[in-house]
């Protein structure tokens, strides 16, 4: 099973990715993790990436694709892989395609923007332990305080409404075009084209998991 999960921040991709990697016995491939590992290991590509990052530059798509190719040769990718946060742009998707990196499915998790803002802006965390709550869906026993310690809960900067709206704008401008890119490719009937599936990300974790499983069997 070789796939990409697409969807806006807050759509629940992380939760569903954890389920898929366990279910299919495949690794979750994050370009951030790959970069850190390559830099730490001092591989030729890692050293090249470190030079760029130390100078405050952005690592090129060619370099990222090189890292992806290296990563996919490792034994844990024998049954497939799940791309996490990659590709983010059309040039990256083109580079992935040109490199002949195979995909079986591209799944879009669709959630209305208003739901995402509500989901993320109502999250609260206990900083010391990392325990998280949701004002509406998973509230603490006593309002505003941690269940275990009774210490106050906080809202992370990332979860503030204005930050969430900014991240959604970035997604719409940069990553949302991938939805059209992959759905068009899937409809083209080209030999290497992945299947494109769209599911609703509204509902309980188990409901979404069930939709995802069905989509990957169709």
Curated annotation (Swiss-Prot):
Q: Which Pfam families does the protein's record reference?
A: ADK (PF00406), ADK_lid (PF05191)
The residues the record assigns to binding AMP are 31, 36, 57-59, 85-88, 92, 156, 167
* Region described as LID: spans on this chain: 122-159
**Which EC number(s) does the record attach to this protein?**
2.7.4.3
Q: Which GO terms describe its cellular component?
A: cytoplasm
Q: Name one GO biological process term.
A: AMP salvage
Compartment annotation: Cytoplasm
| Stored PANTHER family | NUCLEOTIDE KINASE (PTHR23359)
Entry's free-text remark on domains: Consists of three domains, a large central CORE domain and two small peripheral domains, NMPbind and LID, which undergo movements during catalysis. The LID domain closes over the site of phosphoryl transfer upon ATP binding. Assembling and dissambling the active center during each catalytic cycle provides an effective means to prevent ATP hydrolysis.
State the similarity comment.
Belongs to the adenylate kinase family.
Q: What is this protein called?
A: Adenylate kinase
Q: Which gene encodes it?
A: adk
